[in-house]
Amino acid sequence: MDKYGRVQIKFYKETDNPLPEYKKAGDAGMDIRANEDVTIRGFHWATINTGLYIIIPFGYEGQMRSRSGLAAKHGVHVLNSPGTIDSVSYTHLTLPTICSV
């Protein structure tokens, strides 16, 4: 933890995309981008590569979940939302994603 009591999460990337970031002050979660263009047909799913690796401290977890706007406008959801990212030494982030329309 840092001096403010915040858990320190480390990201490493193999992509030119920016690291995950909070779009607005007060956002509960960070936005993450796909590292590839993917077309998901209606009622099908795909695993999307983010090009990111993450280290979460022991005893904590990260969560991946759908953005409400993306889900409402396009029917795109994280398949097992919220998806748990366990505290292991080094995890490659991929998103199992489904198109529900």
Predicted segments, located by residue:
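DUTPase catalytic domain/fold
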Residues: 1-93
